[in-house]
Amino acid sequence: MDPKKIARINELAKKKKTVGLTGPEKVEQAKLREEYIEGYRRSVRHHIEGIKLVDEEGNDVTPEKLRQVQREKGLHGRSLDDPKS
């Protein structure tokens, strides 16, 4: 997210605590917060999708649901053509 938008979120939060927000400012704050949260969720999802879990013996123990997502995206050498990957 653009640093200017994050600064604006913080500015509106501070103003809300001190003098309160106008109607249009409340709408702006809600939109900015939603945009921030969506970006955060995308980032976390991307990070989690890139994880491969292995046990002490080096065996892949990644949950099947995550493996399927990784197959669809071609991550960690997984392929839709090879269901065992």
From Swiss-Prot:
Subcellular location: Cytoplasm
Keyword Cytoplasm included in the entry's annotation: yes
Coiled coil (UniProt feature): none
Keywords linked to the UniProt accession: Cytoplasm
Superkingdom, natural source: Bacteria
Key word rRNA-binding present: no
Disordered as annotated region, ranges: 62-85
InterPro entries cross-referenced by the UniProt entry: DUF896
One GO CC term, this protein: cytoplasm
SUPFAM superfamilies: YnzC-like
PANTHER family: UPF0291 PROTEIN CBO2609/CLC_2481, UPF0291 PROTEIN YNZC
Family: Belongs to the UPF0291 family.
Stated name of the protein: UPF0291 protein SPy_1687/M5005_Spy1383
Organism: Streptococcus pyogenes serotype M1
